[in-house]
Amino acid sequence: RAANPETAADYSYMFNGIAGYPDNLDVTASEDGKTLTVVLSAPCAYFLDLAAFPTFYAVKQETVESAEGYLGDDGSVQNPGAWALEAGFVSSGAYTLTEWKHNESMVYTKNPYYWDAENVKLETLEFMLSADDTAIYAAYNSGDLDFIDTVPNDEIQSLLENPEFHIVDQLGTYYICFNVKSDLFAGKTVEQAADMRKAFSKLIDRQYIIDTVGQTGQKIAATFIPEGMADGNGGIFKANDDAYTFPDAEALGYYGEEVDTEGAIELLKSAGYEFDDSGMLSADTPISFEYLTNESSGHIAIAECVQQDLAMIGIDMTIRTCDWNVFLNDRKAGNYDIARNGWVADFNDPINMLEMWTTDSGNNDVQFGR
């Protein structure tokens, strides 16, 4: 179902390693329905990780296809996700969603039909749905929540010595994405547009963002693939070795970790922009664009850091904040110039960080090839 083009699933490309993709997947079930045999088109070191990813979870066909709104008036699939828009749908996990107040809360109840139900200890799980860091933190302090994974940025320093505050590594990258179809690049050659993006990158003081916003030991990203990613052969992917050495060997990346204002100016000049003797962008060739982010104190703080960095040479960047759903929809639709983004690995293989950049990927927010 997820591989079916009619479903238009964001993660449909995850099935492309299965023989017969996308029209006739070579997957068969045993007579007792308890075993699946999957034939791969090529060796895949991370396939078992894929099998544990939500896109590969089993769903009940009757539940999906009988949902109100699933089919349009002409009989074609209108909304493939209609079956899971409200609480009470059939699922196969340890818990079932029994109550859902949209944008407010969710309640999950132990599923007695789960295959390992006897080892599921908690009867209910209650979730608070909010994008407000301050409200989430207040709910934790008042005892309404037992666990949270976000706190207001201005609370981080005071929490570093708190035994309840845990810093956990993530295999992921926080980044800024450019809409390649944006008017920002109108009239520019492919090379000039690339020079503009590289120039903006050289102006951003990543270490300052880590020290003042992140505050928990994040590392500068000099490549999109993060440190610690497996190479599929028992080693680490991001390394200098006999097969490949990064252009900036010391930073293990494609550019250095330091701000390079002079280099940025030279790149912008090559893209057709003029500068005065003081190194400020000429009024004759202005650069002005909008930065899209969701309403979260940390994301907004990072946007403000970038805004200040670019302003140092006269680039005008305005910040547009919006709620989570609007933010996701606008970014996916390409209704932005530059947007904050982030990707935490779904499984430990570099391909997970790379497949999202293809034209037909559901996560192609930068609009490559569109």
List the predicted regions and their residue ranges:
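Short, well-ordered beta-strand elements
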Residues: 36-38, 93-96, 106-107, 123-128, ...
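Append "and occasionally in soluble cytosolic enzymes with long acidic Gly/Pro-rich linkers
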Residues: 192-308
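Extracytoplasmic/peripheral linker and loop segments enriched in polar/acidic and small residues
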Residues: 20, 27-29, 198, 210, ...
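Surface-exposed binding/hinge segments that line
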Residues: 2-71
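Aromatic- and charge-enriched surface segment that lines or borders ligand/interaction sites
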Residues: 1-7, 37, 136-139, 190-192, ...
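Gly/Pro-rich hinge or "lid" segments in bacterial periplasmic/extracellular proteins
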Residues: 22, 44, 52-120, 124, ...
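A bilobed periplasmic-binding-protein/Venus flytrap-type ligand-binding module shared by bacterial periplasmic
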Residues: 109-113, 171-199, 212
